[in-house]
Amino acid sequence: RISKTVSSLRFDSNFRRTVEESGAKGKASERVVTKSDWQPLVNVAASWKSGMRTSYTSSVSTTETESRVGAGYTSTTTSSSHSFSVQQTIDATKGISLPFASSRKFKLKSSVNLGLVVQYSSVNSTIPPQLSEKKDDLSVTSTATYSFSTNLSGSFNFGFTQNRDLQIGVTRRGLTLGLTASFRF
């Protein structure tokens, strides 16, 4: 049974469609813009009995622009985004078993908070006859905050990013690493 492992669960989904027409008054429309948005397509958030919290959100948006002037054309832009996160709080006051000292527990005077966020987004756009755009972005971020005592606390974070232009074949990647410590006297 899911109720034995999950303390709360939420699900959301929403769709919206709009059509905008423009042109000279009393004449046929020269431009029609149709937007279809799933904001969000899926949004699921769960709190687990273990203290872990997870969430996943996905959104999709499509814009179609039709020009009826002259030969006319139709351009389409589709964008999507996905995000997944996990958060876990570990009660370190009860002790944490370490791999290299399994018989002993390492105790802190507070909890350790761990987090992981993965995000992905993409854009695909086509404007006849030759213009087009196809890009995507990926980021992964992990964080940890801790407090060894009332006088010593800190945080650690690691991040990875990737940006790709699939139309011209260019990829950029980046890494970030951060470590902070706070001493109180």
Model-assigned labels for residue ranges:
Residues 1-185:
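Exposed, low-structure sequence patches enriched in small/polar residues
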